[in-house]
Design a protein with these regions (language model features):
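Short, Lys/Arg-enriched N-terminal segments with co-localized hydrophobic residues
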Residues: 1-18
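Membrane-embedded alpha-helical hairpins and interfacial helices in multi-pass inner-membrane proteins
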Residues: 19-32, 149-235
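Hydrophobic transmembrane alpha-helices
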Residues: 20-96
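Alpha-helical transmembrane segments of integral membrane proteins
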Residues: 26, 30-34, 60, 64-68, ...
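Hydrophobic cores of alpha-helical transmembrane segments in multi-pass inner/ER membrane proteins
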Residues: 34-43, 95-107, 137-145, 205-217
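Short helix-perturbing small/polar motifs within transmembrane alpha-helices
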Residues: 37-49, 119, 125, 132-178
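Alpha-helical membrane-inserting segments
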Residues: 46, 71, 75-79, 97, ...
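Alpha-helical membrane segments and adjacent membrane-interface helices in multi-pass membrane proteins
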Residues: 75-140
Length: 243
């Protein structure tokens, strides 16, 4: 029975998703930089939260933040992934969270989901929490800024074109890859092996860039049937309405 239990634990360990920079890639005094970058990301997230609260209400924000947190845990722990180079290739669906729930709830969900995952499923990742938080949040805010530029104010998110969704998804995933590369080079330098690991990770991540826009469009298409729930406060107002 013990052998069977250990086997199940090994399978779970091998298949669960760990969104992280591998422990040891950035360590010692160098990890202090991540505290500063994470603090900046959290500060901006707080600013976005107050903006969201002014546009909606606390109940709506709290509901969307909880939905985002649950979604992130599902993305991290259930969806398939595979290790490549300095990290793992998997589906974060950051652009999906943004389009459906809004920037602030998405940021809360990513931060809370990452923390819960580290606390209960992967304690070895907790020392890298600030690194991983930066890696997930900064691209989200860049995505938000891009959305404000490429989406007309009169366009609801459910009416986005594939080219717009692709641009948003590529911006987020590209940002994640860029931050992973930064931390890897910052922590381990530009040795041939490290450069090869970073490039193999970036190349493999192109699979995500191809798939996630399709997932976003599918979610937005499904959301069209939920117009009757737009006043329930479970979605960002921009999902169904113009700015």
């Amino acid at each position: 029975m013990s052998c069977e239990h250990n086997s199940i634990r090994r399978v779970w360990r091998d298949w669960r998703i760990e969104m992280h920079i591998e422990p040891g890639i950035v360590d010692g005094a160098k990890i202090a930089l991540s505290y500063a970058t994470a603090a900046g990301a959290v500060t901006y997230a707080v600013k976005e939260t107050f903006a969201d609260l002014r546009a909606s209400n606390f109940a709506s924000y709290a509901a969307r933040a909880l939905i985002a947190t649950f979604g992130v845990l599902v993305f991290f722990e259930v969806l398939p992934h595979f290790p490549v180079g300095v990290s793992e290739v998997h589906f974060i669906l950051g652009s999906t969270l943004f389009l459906v729930l809004g920037a602030a709830p998405a940021a809360f969900g990513l931060a809370a989901g990452l923390l819960i995952q580290g606390a209960f499923f992967a304690p070895i990742d907790l020392p890298q929490y600030a690194i991983n938080l930066t890696t997930l949040l900064v691209p989200l805010f860049a995505l938000h800024a891009l959305a404000n530029r490429i989406i007309a104010p009169k366009t609801a998110y459910i009416d986005l074109k594939y080219s717009q969704v692709l641009a948003l998804s590529a911006a987020y995933q590209g940002g994640v890859v860029a931050w992973v590369a930064f931390w890897a080079f910052y922590g381990q330098g530009f040795g041939a092996a490290n450069v090869a690991s970073v490039f193999s990770f970036g190349a493999a991540y192109m699979l995500v860039v191809l798939i996630e826009p399709i997932a976003d469009l599918a979610v937005l298409y499904a959301a069209k049937s939920l117009r009757g729930f737009e006043r329930a406060g479970l979605f960002t107002a921009r999902l169904f309405n113009a700015a």
